[in-house]
């Protein structure tokens, strides 16, 4: 064979081999490696389905479609498919959701701080859940500033914390936390805690000693080692097989990584589509078997896939008509399905993978239209609460924005005229669910969320002079220069109708809205 013919033969055979490789390589599912389960593909097509909850706030055991949750938050999935959910609000229970969707109660049932079995135990706003290899559950008991343990038989004990807010390392039952929302357990049985309102990550070792892994004396946004690092209201936490701790750093809109030596770095995020808005208030985390992440958002309700290199893709909650409210808890089962709680819609969902080219079908999402409104008894948010007040804005009006666009959005609530400095009062009893319930400090749209009600255009928790209305419920944070920067109200804080929430700012009216974004209703 001539040299030219031989070269052409090599070229042709190489081309055929490359073409064959391209044609037979599937995009999804990924082939199973010989050493274990398949690698988690990026950007898989998702199908959302309802597991349990009828979308009405309440407490009701029974078949999934008729069961009711109040404020479903943390979730774990066992090998047999059973799910456990931490249900806060007025429920304060740990619920069991069987494979067939039937819901029952494992432990709790009243707001308090008591160890015991089943209904004898008491929780105060249970948030995240984690599990150990023996099948025990660990609860971030936010309102009790404690970490609790629940056995498969429903026996509840306190692992760490005194029941009082504070910050102290040391023996577990003498250590103090401040509203912990996140909890995770590694393969050695060590417990990691997102100590939310201390802005720290804590570690409960197997010898019962509590130490601080990372974070300092004040909130902030700095990478570094140990106490040099700063967090801003960390809520979600997970630990992978290599000992790396992942943190949903809520107020910093960031995912943070803590290495085995305690060095904190921020994961650089980049979307698969340049038009997608970046993560907004990451709330919850779950890890895949190969160390990638799923992240739930507080404000948009989206569930996102986040790879270790920072690439991310919206899986659920981003499509028209399929909007979610608050992806508060996430868990991944052995088959790779993602289970999550939608706290604002009082439901539990599952996300499954579809083959490439298969379109997802619409699922039941959002709160039910039958979800009852808060009991306001006709109260107004200003004095006199049973008197006459002028309504200056109603639900559904066409409104402009601050940049001059006259038809920017539909008004999402009710506006009541009030004098600048007038005290804003709660119109119903309520309990704070959001870990970041106050927003836009000193801005025109400053507001506070109490249960399903939002109170806007006020100085949250402050008089016109800036003094706190109630230091036990409102905490004033300062920036590095010592200037006031934010009001913090813990998840689990209660307000009664008539309690002072703030004072009207220079907008000269109070705004009331009810319901998660996309599901607004008339607040009066």
Regions found by a protein language model. Give the residues of each.
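Conserved beta-propeller blade signature
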Residues: 82-85, 136-138, 190-192, 244-246, ...
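Short loop/turn segments immediately following the C-termini of beta-strands
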Residues: 88-89, 142-143, 196-197, 250, ...
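N-terminal Sec-pathway targeting helices
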Residues: 1-14
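A short loop-to-beta-strand structural motif that recurs across blades of beta-propeller domains
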Residues: 92-96, 102, 145-149, 155, ...
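Surface-exposed, glycine-biased beta-strand/turn segments
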Residues: 358-454, 459-466, 488-510, 520-524
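Residue-level detector of Asp-centered blade-edge/turn motifs that repeat once per structural unit
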Residues: 77-80, 131-134, 185-188, 239-242, ...
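Gly/Pro-rich loop segments of beta-rich domains
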Residues: 36-73, 102-127, 155-179, 209-233, ...
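Blade-level signature of beta-propeller repeat domains, shared across WD40, Kelch, NHL, RCC1
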Residues: 326-363
């Amino acid at each position: 064979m001539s040299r030219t013919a031989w070269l052409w033969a090599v070229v042709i055979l190489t081309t055929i081999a490359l073409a064959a490789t391209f044609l037979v390589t599937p995009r999804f599912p990924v082939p199973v490696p010989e050493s274990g389960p398949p690698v988690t593909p990026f950007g898989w097509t998702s199908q959302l389905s309802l597991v349990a909850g009828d979308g009405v706030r309440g407490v009701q055991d029974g078949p999934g479609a008729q069961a009711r949750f109040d404020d479903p938050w943390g979730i774990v999935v066992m090998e047999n498919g059973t799910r456990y959910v931490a249900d806060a609000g007025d429920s304060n229970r740990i619920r069991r959701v069987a494979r067939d969707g039937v819901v029952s109660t494992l432990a709790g049932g009243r707001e308090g701080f008591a160890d015991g079995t089943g209904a004898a135990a008491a929780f105060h706003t249970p948030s995240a859940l984690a599990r150990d290899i023996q099948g025990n559950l660990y609860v971030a008991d936010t309102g009790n500033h404690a970490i609790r343990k629940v056995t498969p038989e429903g026996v509840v004990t306190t692992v760490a914390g005194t029941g009082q807010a504070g910050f102290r390392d040391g023996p577990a039952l003498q250590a103090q936390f401040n509203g912990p929302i996140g909890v995770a357990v590694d393969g050695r049985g060590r417990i990691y805690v997102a100590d939310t309102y201390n802005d720290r990550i804590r570690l409960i070792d197997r010898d019962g000693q509590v130490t601080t892994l990372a974070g300092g004396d004040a909130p902030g946004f700095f990478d570094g080692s140990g106490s040099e690092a700063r967090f801003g209201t960390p809520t979600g936490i997970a630990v992978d097989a290599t000992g790396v701790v992942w943190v949903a750093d809520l107020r910093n809109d960031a995912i943070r990584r803590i290495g085995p030596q305690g060095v904190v770095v921020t994961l650089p995020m980049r979307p698969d589509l340049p038009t997608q808005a970046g993560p907004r208030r990451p709330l919850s985390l779950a890890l895949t078997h190969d160390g990638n992440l799923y992240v739930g958002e507080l404000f948009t309700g989206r569930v996102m896939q986040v790879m270790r290199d920072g690439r991310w893709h919206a899986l659920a909650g981003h499509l028209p008509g399929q909007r979610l409210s608050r992806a508060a808890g996430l868990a991944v089962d052995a088959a790779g399905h993602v289970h999550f709680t939608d706290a604002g819609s009082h439901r539990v969902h599952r996300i499954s993978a579809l083959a490439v080219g298969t379109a997802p079908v619409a699922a039941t999402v959002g709160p039910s239209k039958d979800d009852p409104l808060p009991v306001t008894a006709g109260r107004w948010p200003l004095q006199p609460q049973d008197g006459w007040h002028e309504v200056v804005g109603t639900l559904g009006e066409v409104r402009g924005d601050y940049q001059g666009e006259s038809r920017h959005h539909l008004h999402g609530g009710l506006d009541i005229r009030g004098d600048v400095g007038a005290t804003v009062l709660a119109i119903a009893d309520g309990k704070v669910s959001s870990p970041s319930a106050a927003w836009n400090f000193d801005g025109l749209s400053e507001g506070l969320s109490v249960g399903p009600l939002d109170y806007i255009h006020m100085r949250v928790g402050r008089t016109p002079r800036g003094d706190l209305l109630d230091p036990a419920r409102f905490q004033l944070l300062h920036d590095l220069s010592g200037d006031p920067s934010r009001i913090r109200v813990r998840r689990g804080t209660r307000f009664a109708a008539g309690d002072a929430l703030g004072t009207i700012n220079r907008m000269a009216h109070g705004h009331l809205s009810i319901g998660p974004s996309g599901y607004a209703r008339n607040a009066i």
